[in-house]
């Protein structure tokens, strides 16, 4: 998971 969980799917 990235810290900006909005884009963490790509």
From Swiss-Prot:
EC primary class: hydrolase
A biological process from GO: dephosphorylation
Record's catalysed reaction(s): a phosphate monoester + H2O = an alcohol + phosphate
EC number: 3.1.3.2
Assigned keywords, A-Z: Hydrolase
Regulation: Activated slightly by Co(2+), Ca(2+) and Mg(2+). Strongly inhibited by NaF, Fe(3+) and Al(3+), less so by tartrate, Cu(2+) and Hg(+). Not affected by EDTA, Fe(2+) and Zn(2+).
Noted pH dependence of activity: Optimum pH is 4.6. Activity decreases sharply with decreases and increases in pH and is absent at pH 8.0. When pre-incubated at different pH levels, activity is stable between pH 4 and 9.
GO molecular function: acid phosphatase activity
Temperature dependence (free text): Optimum temperature is 50 degrees Celsius. Activity decreases sharply with decreases and increases in temperature. When pre-incubated at different temperatures, activity is stable between 20 and 50 degrees Celsius.
Domain of life: Eukaryota
Note: Has no activity towards sodium phytate, ATP, ADP, AMP, glucose-6-phosphate, fructose-6-phosphate and beta-glycerophosphate.
Subunit structure, interactors included: Monomer.
Listed name of the protein: Acid phosphatase
Species lineage: Eukaryota, Fungi, Dikarya, Basidiomycota, Agaricomycotina
């Amino acid at each position: 998971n990235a810290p900006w969980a909005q884009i963490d799917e790509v």
